[in-house]
Amino acid sequence: ELADAEGIKLEVCIYGGAALMLAYDSRAITKDVDAVVRPSDVAQRLARRVAEELELPEDWINDDVKMFVAPREGLRTLPWDSAGIAITVPTASYLLAMKALACRKALPGYEGDIADLRFLLRKMEITSVSDVQEHIDRYYPNDVIRAEDEALIAELIEEVRRGQR
């Protein structure tokens, strides 16, 4: 509404847990919204205003994800009934590539990428680590799964195959 009132069209690309929640219905909650919003100067101003009005933390929209955006993105548009905002999310393939490369372990207060990886592996019916690498190659042609993460991803694939979790 705020963007529309100013005659602005914001392009919002939502990543991470919020994308999994909105587009793939895989989670019930996320603590923040990882997003790249253009134009960013207007978006930051409007996000501060929304945070103030809704009593949200100032960093409720986190644009740190922009450091990890692939040279070739795979995005899809979500239906959205607002003239001031266009929302896109990564495809499942692109999210899998991002999550597999990050492969962050759980920490106190942070659940990491394991549950999201498990969900994506199941959704996409991935059967091998090389299948995961093929998705990575589409978006990050110069990156490979770290050796220490390969065993974890193989274990998650096996869990999904056996129908666990």
Regions found by a protein language model. Give the residues of each.
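Compositionally biased terminal segments of proteins
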Residues: 1-165
